[in-house]
């Protein structure tokens, strides 16, 4: 255990020291080394988390938007929403700590009803999840009878339960077309729905939810980036406005962005998404210049080493889903995973 801790600590220090591109979005990790006392606390948190994972037979699932000290330092499984949902099914542990936002923890619980699922901060929410309620879904069914409802995973379990099938930004087009119908409702992300609609012949009716991180990007941002950084490759998340996606060189989920950088190896690239995405993959691509142009998600940043440690120590913030909601919500998620 000590050797594993030391290796991860060394790796993390290398990230901080050798990759200046991380500095703009590594405020917490930078602060860790601002004083001797902070460094000691940082080291103690890392070591304690590894020991607690061992004692409790726990695993940490971390989203790509988590800070590098979590993503590279303590996480056992990392990925985008789709990857975490798929991998959660096969987790061999008694306890799952979801280093992400609440809807992700609910999804992990839906797929692992017998396991203890913890979220380090119960207030880690999501603007998309908060943009729609089960009552809204019921009204949509009345307004558009017989039309399937495809629900983005960035929603509460209660909204999933009122839906027909889920999707992620990585499989939305595939899910929509797999239904074999001419028209669907896609909720709650308006921009994701509009971007998918451009790629398929299926007619898509959208809701009015937006991601507070991705809605801030604009096509003028891309023009400025290209002017300031000639030859830059622009990757955009499909939660961005359609004119941003149209102006980008590539649009895809965070997993697709990572794969693009790995396979294409652009000389310089900018990721129009949450800041930690670039931070976390830059370490694996020292020959790629990552241009900083990102927005922080305040909800993702509520997760810290300290509250991960507390969650494991005190079994704090256990996630539960009412049985009447869990069964239909699980079906909607499982239908997606089966495609």
Swiss-Prot record:
One of its GO terms (molecular function) is metal ion binding. Its main location: cytoplasm. One of its GO terms (cellular component) is cytosol. Iminosuccinate binds at residues 63, 81, 152-154, 169, 237-239, 254. Its cofactor is [4Fe-4S] cluster. Its EC number is 2.5.1.72. Disulfide bonds: none annotated. Binds 1 [4Fe-4S] cluster per subunit. Transmembrane segments: none annotated. Keywords: 4Fe-4S, Cytoplasm, Iron, Iron-sulfur, Metal-binding, Pyridine nucleotide biosynthesis, Transferase. It comes from the Bacteria. InterPro entries: NadA, NadA_sf, Quinolinate_synth_type2. GO terms for biological process: 'de novo' NAD biosynthetic process from L-aspartate. It is found in: Cytoplasm. [4Fe-4S] cluster binds at residues 126, 211, 297. Pathway: Cofactor biosynthesis; NAD(+) biosynthesis; quinolinate from iminoaspartate: step 1/1. It catalyses: iminosuccinate + dihydroxyacetone phosphate = quinolinate + phosphate + 2 H2O + H(+). Catalyzes the condensation of iminoaspartate with dihydroxyacetone phosphate to form quinolinate. NCBIfam families: nadA (TIGR00550), PRK09375.1-2 (NF006878), PRK09375.1-4 (NF006879). Belongs to the quinolinate synthase family. Type 2 subfamily. This is Quinolinate synthase. The gene is nadA.
